[in-house]
């Protein structure tokens, strides 16, 4: 279990100052959770600044290099080999499935642990989808846009004279190969990202509801404890005043009677348990919020890429339908050249945000797994 909980970021600084995932400070306790929630959902939250910071963190570059190496291992002699997604998942997702299962196995099964288990499962499923998308980015580059770029480098620019027949035949042959390439980004109506987002939204709703319940319990205990202290002081004063009249041996009897009447029995362990639950729930809720926002961004980028690639494939089919006509081929190449740079930028943006997802999901899972096993002080004030 110790190895599972010792997920190491790229550097010691990465574990302290580079975390793009907002989460509660352990020292500030439960009192900070409401303020942190407000800061996360605040309309003044500068997303662009946070993203710029996240893309510069050591942990982000560590995850990116690790994923890049893993994907590159699937390319042999320029032939893209479909890798085992589950194997890639075990190398990218930290803490991995085995560590999570071991941690959950040693925790008493309650509604809370069921919610936490659901959180880990959803984050794993979404990471599996993101791994597929990451491979699709490389597939689009390798099979479609690298051959097109090679073709652009051979052909003259728009301002130069018309191409000859040999170049026209070369372009037509390249179009024939590219026409067989399937769009790796499914249409928005068919891919399952929206189901994952719905699961995350439902999970956050359940976590927040459970979080409010735990906070109410601790507040109740806090106020009841304060009330019982005042009641005990009053009882002691009453005993002292009565001591003039009552024999001293009546003091223990009065305390025994006054204690239960002033305050119900509030076990110390109950408050400690609820405070621990609050920290776990807060970590899971914040992680779910951030990850769902990441999925929103990835979802939009995938939708744009699907549309852009479909447009390029339409142009390629149009060029094939017109045959080996020099003028038609040259016009199609002009249109493809114009859309090439925006599409390559979109591929880069999607790749960046998928790597950011890997960074955030690992931090969220590591934080929550640590919270499950972290002793929590009982003196935190709500």
Curated annotation (Swiss-Prot):
Region (Disordered): 1-41
Pfam family, one: DUF677
Annotated keywords: Membrane, Transmembrane, Transmembrane helix
InterPro entries: DUF677
Stretches that traverse the bilayer: 222-242, 246-266
Topology within the bilayer: Multi-pass membrane protein
GO cellular component term of the entry, any: membrane
UniProt biased composition (Polar residues): 30-41
Main location group: membrane
Localization, UniProt: Membrane
Stated family: Belongs to the UPF0496 family.
PANTHER family per the UniProt record, alphabetical: OS04G0405700 PROTEIN, UPF0496 PROTEIN 3-RELATED
Name of this protein: UPF0496 protein At3g19330
Top-level taxonomy: Eukaryota, Viridiplantae, Streptophyta, Embryophyta, Tracheophyta
